[in-house]
Amino acid sequence: LEIIEKFLKAGVMENGKYLDSERGTPQGNGASPILANIYLHYVLDNWFDVIVKRQCKGECYLIRYCDDFVCCFQNQYEAEIFKQRLEERFAKYGLELAGEKTKILEFGRFARHNRKARGERKPDTFDFLGFTFYCGMDGKREFFRCRVKTSKKKFRSKIKAMKEWIKAHRAMPLELIFKTVNAKLRGHYQYYGVTDNTREVKNFLVQTKWLLYKWMNRRSQKRSYTLDTFFNGLLRTFPLLEPSIKVSLFYR
């Protein structure tokens, strides 16, 4: 507790000046994520395991990473009760739910059938840690399977970041440009290269190629490459990493 207290009072450096911490975990302090994680462990995790699970008649689960979390309930009415209790508990400890991210939705192996029987559209999806989770089937369409793909919001932000880097560094030597782009592609594949997401990681590579084609042709006043000389010439000299599934979510 003494160590935590020291972290809370450590303050931050802003524009070369030291600023005292007035309240809560100081933004910009390297320890802030750790302190927030400790806080949520007691406010949310322990409470869910010790109190909520024991009071629920159906199955329930909590999946949390830092301040993002998903709660799963077998019974809808228990999910609605939990949401109300969670808002009250967070308020008690000076926290609040992000309204735009908080919702109750029908999801799981019976969701599609139940919604179809009621004349409703297919089950809703939700985003978590950069992925969109949606109700699907296995390859033979015999069994339910929760499927994932890169969320549209995260895909756009990653493409934008790649575009800004290529644009800003297009005057660098080609070898260094492609080496760095490959490093960025490798990092993207390692995170997003999971089961069911092959199409999205391949699309990321395709979009990256077109960004390179566009900005390599703006290295000088004169047009540098045609489609043929770029795709069949430059990309053969400096090949880009091909995507692959790095993590199997269902087979270990």
Task: Walk through the language-model features, giving the residues of each.
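Non-catalytic terminal/accessory segments
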Residues: 1-252
